[in-house]
Amino acid sequence: VGPNGAGKSTLLKLLLGFLRPKAGKIFLFGKEISQFNEWEKIGYVPQRFSVEKFWTGTVEELLRKVAKKEKVGWIIAFLHLENLLKRQFVKLSGGEQQKVLLALALTKNPSLLILDEPMTGLDIHAQEHIEHVLKEISKDRTVVVVSHDLRFVMRNASRMLCLGMPECRVVYPKDFGQIIRELYGLH
């Protein structure tokens, strides 16, 4: 978490190997990121994604193209995508697209799942459902979430990395409230 401009997106780009650190090293699964070649262990759901440039088919076609057939069924049921399967991805709402992008990331059964603003574009019912899904999938994998939704973070995070303070800090649940007040100047 952190205010705009604190470096949240930059941190994600570093974790995903899109940027190289100017100083220090980043390790993923015990390997320095420049030597890391097991990207299938990482699932990523961007905040915004323009799939229409290369995909005009249905949600079902997209899922089957990306995933092995046996993996798709549980994901469709788990995310309640049944009513979206025959629809074109480009004609879905932003929230519906977000759910499909999460499904695509889960087809890899990643050890690390990185989500950039996963609640963007979701109505309250969809937010509650995605929050439940994230609780379930985080039981057997590491989930990194960038979010401006502080209530979501405080309800779900086991640790919070606070950017935009005098120094970057890892915070545990008992201190969340105090750090949020400091970070956003609330008293």
Where are these regions (language model features)?
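Conserved ABC ATPase "signature" region
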Residues: 70-86
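Catalytic Walker B motif of ABC-type/P-loop ATPase nucleotide-binding domains
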Residues: 113-117
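Conserved ABC ATPase signature
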Residues: 88-92
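Helix-to-loop junction immediately C-terminal to a conserved catalytic motif
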Residues: 16
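Conserved beta-strand-loop-alpha-helix hinge in the C-terminal portion
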Residues: 163-187
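Hydrophobic anchor residue at the start of the ABC signature
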Residues: 102-103
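Conserved ABC transporter NBD signature motif
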Residues: 24-38
